[in-house]
Amino acid sequence: MLNSIHRSFHLTSRHQIVLRLCSPSASRTIMSSSPHSPIPKTHTASLDSLNDYEEQFPPLTGGSKTKKFYLGSTNPSTPCQSSQLQNWTSGKDALSLQRNLGCKNRRRRRASRFLHEESNGTTFEVGAGIGSPTSMVHFDSTNPSSSSKSSQSQNLKIRKVRNHRNSGFKSRDQSPQRIKDPPPFDICSSVLERNDTSIKDWILADETNRETVEVSNKHKVIRPGMVLLKDFLTPDIQVDIVKTCRELGVKPTGFYQPGYSVGSKLHLQMMCLGRNWDPQTKYRKNTDIDSKAPEIPVTFNVLVEKAIREAHALIDRESGTEDAERILPVMSPDICIVNFYSETGRLGLHQDRDESEESIARGLPIVSFSIGDSAEFLYGEKRDVEEAQGVILESGDVLIFGGESRMIFHGVKSIIPNSAPMSLLNESKLRTGRLNLTFRHF
């Protein structure tokens, strides 16, 4: 209708305002006056209503010059004599004006408002947004009894700049920004080159001495089917495991923070090998990004098999029998869940019961590797922290529980800060925290 609209409001003695519309393409003045008064009557409205009106009529692109015309009274006792006013207030614009004067949306009134002084009053220049033209609202004293001094005292000079961070909505010319995915979690503070020579040399030595299993005096059977192998993973092997997990973890199928549909998150970072797992869907072959879960490195499987053999040797030695495989069945893992706990990480008491019924019925064990900071590990027959027993798992320890102990409740109460070996941190650049690998068979 109009290329650009500038609106002016005159402040009266009752703090009401007079509506002006300014058009660069029209120089007509539309006014209506009562036959009983020499002063033109004007359309009046409360300040709040006109603020609502202002926010619903965004400025339009127009010419550089501004000319004004006035809207006269819409009072039924003094009907407007101008067809232009009737035309302007008819149809869509009149309905919009009537509807929007009662607008309840107050947030949009808080849009950026730029004020500057004029010689005859104070002008509010309302910005519609960055890069948008502005409309003008004049507050002039029109009370004949008011003096010029009182009029000048009403002049204000306020300048507000829109703050996008605090505004409850985006400007008209600002398109919604796409929320970017968080970068992959890196368990290391810097990138190091891979070096698998330690694990490979250890595997060759293990193949040569497979029949001879030396049992450390530090190893112990905690309960039937539950064995702790202290310092089973040598420092060099720990470094190689960290590097391997880091290489897999920074990929799209790597570490993530699992959570529930209600929004709560586990206090750890997780990566799944062999099969994907999360608290909602349990096990599945594909990951959340619709791709196959990474395979378990062969070197990891070799370490698990050797740990189980050493646990069998320990059970046979302490029991005086050769019935270890019945107490702790042999297991070839096809799932590895890698968890990284920060210094504040923890995991509540739970049972590992998402594997197949056959796997659980046979008591196929869970094998857990600990690397980095030590952890206070809890276990018990019930989900009761007060009754649970505890053991400290240090870097290099391997914990195995199967058979009768397969369905025990277990969890991580706390991480002991600054307890990781300095040689491990220096060589692997592992972040402060605990890296835990748990192997199982589905």
UniProtKB/Swiss-Prot annotation:
Bias (Low complexity): 145-154
Stated name of the protein: DNA N(6)-methyladenine demethylase ALKBH1D
Origin species: Arabidopsis thaliana (Mouse-ear cress)
Database matches in InterPro entries: Alkb, AlkB-like, AlkB-like_sf, Oxoglu/Fe-dep_dioxygenase_dom
Gene Ontology terms describing biological process: DNA repair; regulation of seed germination
Annotated ranges, domain Fe2OG dioxygenase: 332-442
Primary location recorded for the protein, binned into one broad class: nucleus
Family: Belongs to the alkB family.
Places the protein is found: Nucleus; Cytoplasm
Sequence positions that bind Fe cation: H350, D352, H410
Reaction catalysed by this enzyme: an N(6)-methyl-2'-deoxyadenosine in DNA + 2-oxoglutarate + O2 = a 2'-deoxyadenosine in DNA + formaldehyde + succinate + CO2
Annotated region (Disordered), positions in chain: 135-185
